[in-house]
Amino acid sequence: MNYRRVNYLWDDDVTSKLDPVERLIYRSNILGSDQRITNTGGGNTSSKITKQDPLTGENVEVLWVKGSGGDLRTSKRENFSSLYQQKLVDLQKLYAKEPEKGPKTPAEDKMVAMYTHATFNLNPRASSIDTPLHSFIPFKHVDHMHPNAAIAVAAAKNSERLTKEIYGDEVIWTPWLRPGFELGLALQRVCAEHPNAKGVILGQHGLINWANDDKECYELTLSLIEKAANYIEAKYERKGGDAKAFGGPKYQTLDEVRRSQVFAAILPWLRGRVSQKNRFIGTIQDDENILRFVNSSDAPRLAELGTSCPDHFLRTKIKPLYVDWNPQSEDVDVLKKKLQSGLQKYRQDYAAYYNRCKRPNSPAMRDPNPTVILIPGLGMVAWGKDKSESRVTAEFYNCAVEVMRGAEAIDQYIALPQQEAFDIEYWLLEEAKLQRMPAEKSLARQVIAVIGAGSGIGKEVAHRIVKEGAHVVCVDLNKDAALATAKEITDKYGVGIGVAGTGLSDCGPAVGLSANITDRASVRAMLNDTVLAYGGFDSIAITAGIFVSPDTTGHIPDDKWGLTFAINVTGSYVVADEAAKTWQEQGLQGNLVLTTSANAVVAKKGSLAYDTSKAAANHLTRELAMELAPLVRVNAVAPATVVQGSAMFPRDRVIASLAKYKIPYAEDEPTESLTQKLAQFYADRTLTRSPITPADQAEAFYILLTKALSKTTGQVITVDGGLHEAFLR
């Protein structure tokens, strides 16, 4: 079969070398790699495999199924749970004895805890809520996907009729039923009543299908999606295609430059208002598909209906916030006013939804702010606790838009009833999963720009704070160096599971940007790019600096003097002055950490410009603390003699210092050896007798950027190993 709507990726040469579990993982990965087949984190796969029981030595049938959490695209063996198939089937007898059973009853939820009793070979992976769906279908291999095309059929008003029209008797339709034990039993009945059926369209949910051969199951999944997609696209084109989608366009898209300008202007302000309870990280989506939707006549109606697939609204909430702004005739101030009133109404609507649908044992109401905001002419902004989550949220609403497009093309889109949506969103099992999440790290939900991140202390600071959950904007005059640091971080920590985002917003926990801090326009552009990547920023650490040696006569020329002050003093002021505008718009507490030096309080020959500039930077720290209070704390780190890993100690300066202090060395001696000699000399002068490294400085930056010293501002923290002459007085 030729596939036009999905990617066929099965490779017999690969699978022939894999064991049965590895084949399941392979199947899962290639299914999950195509967003048209399933969304990130959505769907699950299984195989019933004969294994030797470690207790009895006998062969038993084991269900291997994608466990709770995780993502098909990136899943490995440890992401799959393994359970005795017969024990899972036997749970039906236990369930049958419950006096009060049925959908959404305590008896049904009780079964979830029983899955652990069926664990095979002490596999620690928690079982998915969908485990019964896979166990109770009497076939070896099962794929449960959330394809946009299939959900479009499932979310159509006449879904049952459309399923029959598209698939005949090959696929059976079932009405909405919350995932769990009852849905597993319902699928078991379908298989018994329709022995020739190959799959089921789950009303307002997705697709599930099966086979006794894993390759056949994979190909069946693709062919069923292909049939639905072909049916939808034929109807879509007959209705006028893109030109008539969602009732046709009502507004026109702003050009790319103007979109970036408006996003840069509104996002910090918007982030501050949606982050009243918890800080959010943003993702922009302004591709052709999302713009077609937000600009359309039907967008307000469809957005208000909300999403359908359970996976979607767990991230996107019951509905997005749509702002009816005319990009051709209204300005940014009008947009802010409409956003403000829209946010107020959204919170009221969410509270009303909660109070209307809550049950006696429902968890407390969660953050009432929207996680998806739709703006004509601009696109979509999605919010999450970190970049990966906000990208997943954006992806899910991308999928929701495709579902609505398909459903409207073939029929009429209907959303899941609000009570059903609430019972998923506030399901006690979901709440328990949230409560089991580890505590957030000290810099979680924070966006921090590190200026000077291409080398030395700045690079070390970037690595230190991302370890604690920060999103890091690696900034350097040398763009290649900034990008290299960002790549090191991304390679180490990954980009997360989200795949959405456009432009700079298509990023992970770190981005690399270039900026010249002596050029105000360059600084503003860098800060705007930071906003476009993450929606705003919280703190800035400035480690960029310069040391200019005197000429051979010991004189500092005027241009070198000016350059030293431009970088070491004025640059920090320019960054602070520009950042202050964004901080004020955002209205969230932040930090600014400068780099001064122990030299700022120690007069000596040979470093007149540098020492004087750092003395000015010390006082700049105090002045900025006054200017930016109470919103922003301003402190500084004063390093001394950081030789190893420092861009300020190139080989020629190291040699000059060795000669100055009469430390023996050879001209052809390796740079590393020369650096170690100088570092040890400096260490021996300190009270702690310890070499000072970039990592030592990074620790001080980290502490100042956290809440650990939340009552400290206007201070300089010296990290010099203990130079008594540099004690601050």
Regions found by a protein language model. Give the residues of each.
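Residue(s) in the substrate-gating loop at a strand-loop-helix junction
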Residues: 597
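Glycine-rich flexible loops
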Residues: 1-448, 460
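Short, small/polar-rich loop/turn modules that mediate ligand/substrate recognition or access, typified
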Residues: 629-633, 712-714
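Active-site helix of classical SDR
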Residues: 576, 613, 621
